[in-house]
Structure formats: C-alpha cells, structure tokens
Regions:
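N-terminal secretory/targeting leader peptides
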Residues: 1-88, 108-109, 113-300
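A gly/proline- and charged-residue-enriched helix-loop-helix capping module
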Residues: 86-107
Length: 300
C-alpha cells in the first residue's frame, strides 16, 4: 500500500501554483497516493493557516507567499522591501546564492519545516478603481488591500493609502462587496481573483518580486525511506523549473487578456519609482539595522 501525502494550496484551478502542484503530484503518483485540497479558502480557511497545518502535520506539503511567514521568520521581509530589487533575476540570484540556504536552515531549526524550494509569485503591481499610481497624490485616501503583514500595512500607509489588511480568503469577499479601492498583486492573481471586473486602472509598478515557500513537514519527511526522500526532492526540483517557466508564460499572455477587459494599463517610469523609493527608504534602513546579516547587496 502506498503512503498518503496530504497537500494543500490556496488558489483556483487556473493558478500557476495549482497547476505546478498538479505537476508535482503527477511526478510522484507512482510512489505515493495524494489527498489534495487545491484552495482551502473555499472551505472558509485563511491562506495563512497553511503554515500551522503543515507544521502540525495536518497536511504534509504546501506552498504560500513568503510574506505570511514574517512573524515566524522576520528575515523573510528582505523580499518585501519595496523598490529594493531592480528585477526578478536579481532576486532569483540572491535566493540561489545566499538566501535559500539561510531560509532552509531557519525553517528546519525553528519551524519543523523542510524547504523544497522557492516558487515565482510574480512581480507585484497596483490597481485602483480611480486612477493610475504615479505619485503620492494618486495614492491619497484610497483603501488598498494589503496582506496582514505589518510591514506591508505600514509601507502603504506611508505612501498615502489607507491600508486594509486582509487574508486572501477575505480579500476575495471584499472585492465582490466593493469594499476596497485598490490592491496590489501579480498579474496572475489580478486575473484569477477577478480584480479586472471592478478595478480598471492597472499600474505596472513592480514594487515587489514575490516568491512562495514550497515546504514539507520535516518530521514526516525524516521518517520516509531514503529513496522516497530522494524522489520527493527530485520532483520538487523539476517542479520549480516547471513553475518558473509557467509563471513567465502566464505573465506574457495576461497583459492582452487584461486589456481585453477594458482595463487601462500604465507602466511606472524609473523616475517615478525612484521618487517612491525615497519615500520608503527608511523601511529598508530599519530592516538592515535590525538584520545586518541580510545585507547581501554587495554580492547580488
């Protein structure tokens, strides 16, 4: 009899992440049986609950945007410093060269989790129901959905928005009830969450380049046979390559799909990004004062 692995996520069928988890499961289907809850928010659960569910071995494998780990792993906020990285490849290089090892050790030592890898969660952009975002005045008095991250809340308040922290579960409801004026997400989430139906101004700000942590319960993993562990690690590595490719393909086609929904799109200029960078620079400085070992800037 094959061992059963319980897997869970927080996005729908069309999501890059859901399709990537499908790929991972298929790679291992000859060795393991799987119970897969694709979107726990449909069951009324918060996306953030995936962390405790995996740590406690209620499920064995999950993915989740790294920001949700900030209270348990505050150094992860390096990936959440707005306008800090110039492009996604810069972040990927940092992860591969330095950050992966650090995060992996922290998860194993402190959280009973084993890191299977980082997934591409997309460049994050800002949409509103009023106008494009190009200076502080364009942010003024807009109620923007942020994650429950204290850093995110403070950053958007600083820019002039009114931060409304919501888990993915509650964000979907706030959208349908028209209770927010703005939000920030990668293009794939903008589309799959249906933001294009109510927010017709999309600013390509690339203020963050997001990544998900793809993890397995450490106790569960350690009890597996060596061959089973090898198969999971091999499948995880192949899934990361597949997921990165899928994410790039998704982004390239989504712009036209979004435009076809009568959404106006504006790309933030370098000068505008630099002006916003000056505004949020204190958050960068505070982070590196608190976590000086996270200043990998010289080696990026």
């Amino acid at each position: 009899m094959k061992k059963v692995i319980k897997v869970a996520g927080y996005q729908g069928e069309a999501s890059v992440h859901t399709r990537s988890m499908d790929f991972f499961i298929n790679e291992l289907s000859k060795t393991f049986d799987f119970e897969y809850e694709k979107d726990i928010t449909l069951l009324g659960k918060k996306a953030s609950s995936l962390i405790d569910m995996t740590r406690n071995n209620d499920i064995q494998i999950s993915y989740l945007w790294s920001s949700y780990y900030e209270k348990l792993l505050p150094e992860i906020q390096l990936l959440d410093l707005p306008f800090y990285f110039k492009n996604k490849n810069e972040v990927k290089t940092l992860i591969d060269d330095k950050f992966n090892k650090f995060v992996s050790e922290k998860l194993e030592d402190d959280l009973n989790l084993k890191l299977l890898g980082f997934w591409d969660n997309g460049a994050r952009h800002i949409s509103t129901n009023r106008s494009f975002i190009n200076d502080e005045s364009s942010c003024s008095d807009l109620k923007i959905r942020t994650t429950p991250s204290e850093l995110h809340i403070n950053i958007f308040n600083k820019l002039g928005f009114i931060s409304c922290p919501l888990d993915v579960r509650d964000f979907k409801k706030a959208l349908s009830d028209d209770k927010i004026d703005a939000q920030e997400n990668p293009l794939t989430n903008f589309w799959n969450f249906g933001v294009q139906k109510s927010q017709k101004f999309l600013t390509l700000s690339s203020h963050l380049f997001g990544f998900c942590l793809f993890v397995v319960n450490q106790d569960f993993f350690n009890k597996l046979k060596d061959k089973e562990q090898e198969l999971i690690l091999k499948a995880a590595k192949e899934t990361i390559s597949y997921q990165y490719k899928l994410a790039e393909e998704d982004d390239s086609k989504l712009i036209d799909m979004i435009k076809n929904e009568n959404v106006q799109i504006y790309e933030m200029t370098i000068n505008e990004k630099n002006n916003f960078l000056k505004k949020v620079k204190p958050f960068h400085n505070n982070f590196f004062l608190q976590f000086p070992k996270m200043n990998f800037n010289e080696v990026i």
